[in-house]
């Protein structure tokens, strides 16, 4: 049983992909703000932080926006027979209020718990063990602002984090979309890459 993204990793596509770049239209958004380099180890934290902070600002629902982080904290607590991880996430969430530096710092700490849920405790590294950088927090604010502008231009978000219950198969058992408007499914990518045929097939 695979997720959509795991299944795509096993698919051999033709040179330009099954859903080639030529089928897409591209728009450039320019805010004259330059992203700063961050260590590769922080790239996934940056992407998740932008995703979750954007969801929270749009919905106002902290528990839903940071659900995976909370599930990860619960996994940590289960293994260590404690409730400290969950308490820490909830404490950090109290200081997530919007598009500001304090929120960015706390969100980056919160998403560290995702790994415990997504990949297991073997790969989990607590916020206290993670070496954060100022560049990371700056980038999260810039990228979140860009995301909000993009989504506003696309149209009103009517739902987010949707799954496809009843639409999975014996081969693909999970997959979701980030945002839904009245006429568009949106899968948000926070990446320095230009285009990927894996993204388009997804």
Predicted stretch roles:
Residues 22-24, 130, 135, 162:
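Short non-domain terminal segments
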Residues 178-194:
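Conserved catalytic cores of phosphodiester-cleaving nucleases, focusing on short active-site segments
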Residues 153-182:
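Active-site metal-binding core of divalent-cation-utilizing nuclease and nuclease-like domains
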């Amino acid at each position: 049983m695979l997720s959509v993204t795991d299944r795509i990793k096993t698919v051999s596509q033709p040179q330009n992909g099954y859903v080639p770049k030529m089928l897409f239209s591209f728009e450039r958004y320019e805010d004259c703000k330059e992203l700063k380099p961050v260590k590769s180890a922080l790239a996934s934290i940056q992407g998740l932080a932008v995703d979750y902070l954007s969801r929270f600002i749009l919905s106002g629902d902290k528990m839903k926006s940071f659900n995976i982080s909370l599930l990860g904290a619960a996994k940590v607590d289960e293994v260590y027979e404690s409730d400290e991880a969950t308490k820490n996430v909830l404490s950090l969430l109290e200081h997530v209020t919007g598009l500001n530096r304090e929120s960015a710092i706390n969100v980056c700490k919160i998403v560290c718990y995702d790994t415990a849920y997504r990949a297991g405790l073997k790969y989990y590294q607590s916020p206290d063990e993670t070496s954060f950088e100022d560049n990371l927090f700056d980038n999260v604010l810039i990228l979140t602002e860009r995301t909000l502008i993009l989504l506003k231009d696309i149209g009103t978000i009517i739902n987010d984090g949707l799954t496809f219950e009843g639409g999975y198969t014996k081969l693909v058992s999970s997959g979701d979309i980030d945002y839904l408007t009245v006429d568009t499914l949106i899968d948000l990518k926070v990446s320095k890459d230009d285009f990927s045929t894996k993204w388009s097939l997804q």
